[in-house]
Amino acid sequence: MEVPVGPGPRQAGGGLGATRSSSSGRAARTAEMPWARFSAWLECVCVVTFDLELGQALELVYPSDFRLTDKEKSSICYLAFPDSHSGCLGDTQFSFRMRQCGGQRSLWQVDDRSYNNKAPLALQREPAHYLGYVYFRQVKDSSVKRGYFQKSLVLVSRLPFVRLFQSLLSLIAPEYFEKLAPCLEAVCNEIDQWPAPVPGQTLNLPIMGVVIQVRIPSRVDKLESSPPKQCDQENLLPAPVVLTSVHELDLFRCFRPVLTHVQTLWELMLLGEPLVVLAPSPDVSSELVLALTSCLQPLKFCCDFRPYFTIHDSEFKELTTRTQAPPNVVLGVTNPFFIKTLQHWPHVLRIGEPKMSGDLPKQVKLKKPSRLKTLDTKPGLYTSYTAHLHRDKALLKRLLKGVQKKRPWDVQSALLRRHLLELTQSFIIPLEHYMASLMPLQKNITPWKSPPQICPFRQDDFLRSLEHAGPQLTCILKGDWLGLYRRFFKSPHFDGWYRQRHKEMAQKLEALHLEAICEANIEAWMKDKSEVEVVDLVLKLREKLVRAQGHQLPVKEVTLQRAQLYIDTVIGSLPKDLQAVLCPP
């Protein structure tokens, strides 16, 4: 059964989103911060239905005072339904990512800094995009004119917790499709009782009579191929459903048809190359795109990516134009029309229908882009790219042996994740070592002078350092590592990595400078200083203190206390009129 596309999505009237909840639970909460806890997890919940006259229609948005622009509503409507080529019968779960438009969102605001400062870079809140997690149902229904019930429940968030939100949808959506609005209102009120996601904490999240236990990853976690085990310290009834990860997908299942090309795909992701993933359905396309963008961890994926993208998207023309080079984006699509539209793209991955048998599916072949001409193009990785590194045959043998021995898929995924993690770390460690060498020595940081500058990153110097401190120290793979680094320097990921590391080093430098000031004899320094110099010191110390207290500087609490004491001491030494200016009542 095809999902038809109408003239365009429009707002359908009525429904839960039409009025604000007035339940007693809602009334009991603080008026100044409505939906504060809910908004720590989700932006809103949307229901998209198919209307014979309107096409895809936004039936409701909840909470009702969350503001979506018309363009965002249109995008959600189209992205919430599989296109007509997918033929998804039954229940389908997938995800999408769309650009935010400007304008005020809601009556509440979530401060991202506290979470982002502690979260792994790859799991920080999206600053400019929404992530949509979709549960779509299409089943025969004789009571409907078209003969089919077609509806999607969409969780809109800025958190990339795909595993958590998919699990949440699998609980909520079937119940919602049966009971509709009252069920959704109750669920949203339950989420509004959840504690905020705090990196490093294990949380128990009650929903519809079930407790989901999750651990929010932290930036200081030891990188492993599998997440830390959950620990339940409370005697919870009912016993919690433990999610081993809020974000990790089943990598082995996602990569099954392309295992022989995992390293080539890893290189393409590392270099930020434009890639189209053409899959038979949005669940396959979105999972594969998310798997590809996650295979660089702990590196943050700095390019654009769209797990599911349609020809109706408001950015369709922008991303498919032939007037300029293809953008650095990974597109997940299901409409074969994209093969013709994106023929000029350098890399196209065509995936066939998934086969869930125990055997390894037929691997897609590497093919030249010139063979990508017809709408019935066969599965394959169409690219003229030649991998810099040799294929790890030992990994493929281990995975194949696991298939033959019917090894659990989560174990297979752990093997694959560890391989990709070690590969990325082997590539990044030399960069980290070289970057660390650019940091000024601590002995050169003196309290009464501006801290020294970080030395510039010189690519030639780095490449020369690889001879004795390169990836060969931690990785057995042979190949043209130098060539890979040279191309990496031109990619968005080098720029993103360098900016982040430089920012962290600059903050560390400033923190060390603050510590040096706090350890100095400030009274001895003030003896021969003018009032202007003393006031200047107060202002600079205050600025550093404000930045440090805003978690922007890595300093200890004792240093902050000492800095405040120094400020008070310095101000106390000034004339009364200046004290009044610096410390107004």
Curated annotation (Swiss-Prot):
Segments of this protein annotated with the region Disordered: 1-25
UniProt keywords, alphabetically: Cytoplasm, Endosome, Guanine-nucleotide releasing factor
- The segment(s) forming the dDENN domain are 375-499
Report whether GTP-binding shows up as a keyword of the record.
Answer: no
GO MF term set: guanyl-nucleotide exchange factor activity
Give start and end of each uDENN domain: 43-221
Pfam families in the cross-refs: DENN
Query: Which InterPro entries does the record cross-reference, listed alphabetically?
Result: cDENN_dom, DENND6, Tripartite_DENN
Low complexity biased stretches? 1-10
Q: Which GO terms describe its cellular component?
A: recycling endosome
Record's keyword annotation contains Protein biosynthesis: no
Q: Where in the cell is it found?
A: Recycling endosome; Cytoplasm
Annotated signal sequence range: none
Annotated cDENN domain residues: 246-373
Report the function annotation for this chain. Answer: Guanine nucleotide exchange factor (GEF) for RAB14. Also has some, lesser GEF activity towards RAB35.
The record's similarity note reads: Belongs to the DENND6 family.
This chain belongs to the protein called Protein DENND6B
Per the UniProt entry, what species is this protein from, by scientific name?
A: Mus musculus
